[in-house]
Amino acid sequence: VAYQIYPKSFLDTNGDGIGDLRGIISKLDYLKKLGIDIIWLSPIYKSPFVDQGYDISDYYAIAEEFGTMEEFDELLSEAKKRDMYIIMDLVINHCSDQHEWFQKALADPDGEYADYFYFRKGRNGNPPSNLRSYFGGSCWEPVPGTDKYYLHMFAKEQPDLNWENPLLREKLYEMINWWLEKGLAGFRIDAIINIKKDLDFPDFKPDGPDGLAGCWKMVDEVDGVGELLEDLKKHTFQKYEAFT
């Protein structure tokens, strides 16, 4: 039996109005009595929280609102004592615009880190294509001081990561394995179907009065996501027999 916990509203133990890891630890016995085997945590990574923590600015850090890495390690240890498993949300289609990678990309739009994302030149003063983000408005946001745009299928503060770049994939795999080495049992993978893009970024027939077309149309028509997922599995989850 798996149970999802939204840490922000679960249990606040320090009186700041925000639920925390200490609150989850304190309720493990109760959760065990309910028959829960797996606890799935919504995002607890460092984040500006533009999108409830699904905009991650540091994959290796716990948001201070929720506690510390030491408390997270304690949660893993206490759960293990009770034969319970901890899994977390894994958000790797995109990151936060405050992430170090994206900040470096903005500083040098023609450099190495720009290829961690999708930077494209506009078309005749317009965005590279007429894709609409899942949150509304264009999927493309101007890169300040350039004639380029960056792709975001969700909020503009959530630039999409370029899964065609093997160096980017390697960095993500390293991060995933780091958490699994800690003793995390696995991940619930967020928005993963979106990682494969049509690199030509064609226009689609508009489906609304804004002249844009839902970005899901590109996702539906492009092939290759299965190969990317197999590569992800091979280099991470498979080695640890992780839940996904």
Roles of regions detected by a PLM:
Residues 1-177, 181, 194-244:
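Acidic/aromatic-lined carbohydrate-recognition and catalytic surfaces
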Residues 184:
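Conserved protein kinase catalytic-loop anchor
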Residues 39, 187-189:
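Hydrophobic residues within beta-strands of alpha/beta enzymes
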